[in-house]
Design a protein with these regions (language model features):
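A structural motif
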Residues: 36-39, 76, 104
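Glycine-rich, proline-tolerant flexible connector loops at the mouths of alpha/beta enzymes
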Residues: 40-66, 170-171
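N-terminal small/glycine-rich loop or linker at the start of catalytic domains
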Residues: 1-19
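Catalytic cores of alpha/beta
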Residues: 22-25, 87-99, 146-155
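Alpha-helix-loop-beta-strand connector modules within alpha/beta enzyme cores
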Residues: 6, 53-83, 128-134, 186-198
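Active-site-proximal loop/turn and secondary-structure-junction residues that shape catalytic pockets
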Residues: 8-12, 46-50, 83-87, 111-115, ...
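Catalytic alpha/beta core domains of metabolic enzymes, predominantly
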Residues: 106-200
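Conserved, mostly hydrophobic/aromatic
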Residues: 27, 34, 45, 107, ...
């Protein structure tokens, strides 16, 4: 089956697209419309309602209000926030959302390797996944290069990737990763660890 995820604003400004939602009410309006059109997942960046500035980890109340409004109309849709990775001080909103009455149904972990892997790896991505597991929050893993799949294999060895992997493959117009297309996609899928079912 196809699962549709709607990323409704990211960091795009209204100057580029006047329909881009900023604050929680606008985010909810667009999120509800996407859910009613068939999206199963809504990804929303908390943004200042006037300036559109990303609130990132400071946007807990914005996230909560947007998600309450979406779930009131579309209780079956999954909604989840952004997180910048790099350091855990950029992810406190994830754990606050997980502990809130609204809860956190999904998170995303992008591969931003720091210093490679060793037997005692303490990279922030591993710590983040361990914390998400402790809070019982499922997560997808985002990759931008074929080499990132080697990290996914290591996460599997460490028990951070289960038998089912939700993989986000980022394509863009820059010269990062393989050329977008079926051949490039297959290059990623060929590197999925043995015994793992991959949803992408």
């Amino acid at each position: 089956p196809m699962i549709i995820e709607a990323s409704i604003n990211e960091s795009v400004s209204k100057d580029v697209n006047p329909h881009i939602p900023y604050g929680p009410e606008e985010g909810a309006e667009v999120g509800i419309a996407c859910a009613q059109a068939g999206a199963a997942i809504v990804h929303y960046h908390a943004r200042d309602p006037i300036t559109g500035e990303n609130e990132w980890e400071r946007g807990l109340e914005t996230y909560l209000e947007c998600y309450r409004l979406i779930r009131r109309e579309c209780p079956d849709v999954l909604v989840y926030p952004t997180q910048r990775g790099y350091t855990l001080d950029k992810a406190p909103h994830l754990f606050a959302l997980a502990a809130s009455e609204e809860g956190l149904e999904l998170a995303t972990v992008d591969v931003f390797p720091q210093g490679g892997f060793s037997s005692n790896d303490s990279s922030v991505m591993i710590t983040l996944m361990e914390e998400l597991q402790r809070h019982r929050v499922p997560y997808s893993i985002g990759v931008r290069e074929i080499g990132h799949m080697r990290h996914v294999a290591r996460y599997r060895e460490l028990g951070l990737v289960g038998d089912t992997l939700v993989l986000k493959i980022f394509w863009n117009e820059t010269s990062v990763g393989p050329t977008p297309g079926m051949r490039g996609l297959q290059m990623y899928l060929d590197e999925v660890p043995p015994g793992v079912t991959c949803q992408w």
